[in-house]
Amino acid sequence: MSQLKYLITFSILLRFGFFFFGLYQDEYMPVKYTDIDYLVFNDASKFVYQGLSPYLRETYRYTPILAILLIPDNFGKYWYHFGKLLFMVSDVITGLIILKLLSKQQQLSEKKKMILSSIWLLNPMVITISTRGSAESVLTVMIMLSLYYLLDKDNVILSAIWLGLSIHFKIYPIIYLPSILYYLSSQETPFLASVPGINLVNAKNLKYIIITLTTLAVVNYLMFLKYGWEFIDNSYLYHVTRLDHRHNFSVYNMVLYYKSALLEDSNGFDIEKIAFVPQLLLSAVIIPLIFAKEDLISSLFIQTFVFVAFNKVITSQYFIWFLIFLPHFLSKTKLLTTDKITGISCLLLWIISQATWLYFAYKLEFLGENTFDNGLMYSSVFFFLSNCWCTMKFIQSL
C-alpha cells in the first residue's frame, strides 16, 4: 500500500511541476503554455461574477456551471489560476477512482494496479491538458463517480445523478446510458421476461433512466431559467452544426474546411448535421448490445474510442474521454498478455498516424505551406483508418 501512496504523491508533485513550468513559460516564452480555452473560461466567469451572462464572452460554448465553478478566478491576482488547480484536483480524483475500481479485480497484483493506474496518473498528456487549463477533468471525475457508485457501491441513485450531471456538462456521455441500462438488465429479473425488448426492463434500470433524465432536465431547466435560449444554443445546438476545421484530426476536416468557405446561402450538402448518424449507431447501439452485459467499462472504452474516431471534430483533449477507461480495458484484454505484438502495433499506429497529421499541421501553421489537400486530407484519412483497425483489434482481444 505504501507504493500506491508514493505513486499518488508523485502524481500530485508532477502536476505541480507542470503547473509551475507553465507559469514560467507564460511569462518568458513566446509560445504560451495556458490553453486559449482557459482564457475563455476566465472571461466567462468574470461576467458571471458581475451578475451577467457567461455567453457575453464570444466563443464560450459550455454550460454556465463551468463559469460558476471558476468564479474564484476573479477574487484577486493570486486567484487567477484557481481553475487550473480545480482541474488538477479533478484529474487526481479521477485517477484515484480508476485505482479504486481496479482494486475490485482480485486477480490483479499491487504492481499491476500501479502500472495500469499510472496510465492516467503519470500520463504527460493527461497532466498537460489539466495544467494548461482544460476542463475535461471535471467531466471525467463526474463520469468516474457515476461508475464508482454503480460498480463499487451499488448505489443506483447517486450513479444516475452523476451521469445526468455529466450529460449536462457535455452531451456525449449520453452514449453510456444504453450500456448501463443493458448492464443493469442482467442484475434483476425483468418485468416481462418473455417479451422481446421489454424483457430488458427491470426495476433497477427503470429507476436509473428516470433519475438520470430527471437530473439532466432539472439542471437544464435551472440554467434555462437563468440564461434562456442562449444557454441552449451555445451549450447544445451549436455542437450539432459545428464547423470547426482548425486543429482537427477528423476525417471530416477537409469537408468542413471547404464548407466553411462557401457562402452562407449556398445549397451545399450539410454533412455536419448527419455525421452523428454512423457515430451514434456504432457507439450507442451496436457496441453496447455486444459488450455491456459482459464487461461494462470495456464497453465504455470501445464506445468512446469509436465515438471520438467518428466525430466531426477531434482534438487532443478528446483522447482524455477514452483514456479514463483504458486501464480497466488493458486489465481485461489479451493485448498485454498473449497478443502483445498486436497491442504494440495498435499503439505505434495510433501515434504515427497522429504524428503524420501534426507534421502537416505544423507546416501549415508555422511555415505557411499549403498542406491542406496533399497532406492534411490524407493524414486525416490515415488517422481514421488507423482508429478503425485499432477498434477491430480491441474487439477481437476481449
Curated annotation (Swiss-Prot):
GO MF annotation: an example: alpha-1,4-mannosyltransferase activity
GO cellular component: endoplasmic reticulum membrane; glycosylphosphatidylinositol-mannosyltransferase I complex
Localization: Endoplasmic reticulum membrane
EC category: transferase
Biological-process GO terms, alphabetical: fungal-type cell wall organization; GPI anchor biosynthetic process; hyphal growth
A Pfam family: Mannosyl_trans
Pathway assigned in UniProt: Glycolipid biosynthesis; glycosylphosphatidylinositol-anchor biosynthesis
Membrane topology: Multi-pass membrane protein
Enzyme Commission no: 2.4.1.-
InterPro entries: PIG-M
The organism's place on the tree of life at top rank: Eukaryota
Alphabetized UniProt keyword annotations: Cell wall biogenesis/degradation, Endoplasmic reticulum, Glycosyltransferase, GPI-anchor biosynthesis, Membrane, Transferase, Transmembrane, Transmembrane helix
Signal peptide: none
Family: Belongs to the PIGM family.
Role noted for this protein: Mannosyltransferase involved in glycosylphosphatidylinositol-anchor biosynthesis. Transfers the first alpha-1,4-mannose to GlcN-acyl-PI during GPI precursor assembly. Required for cell wall integrity.
Protein known as: GPI mannosyltransferase 1
Organism whose genome encodes this protein: Candida albicans (strain SC5314 / ATCC MYA-2876)
Gene: GPI14
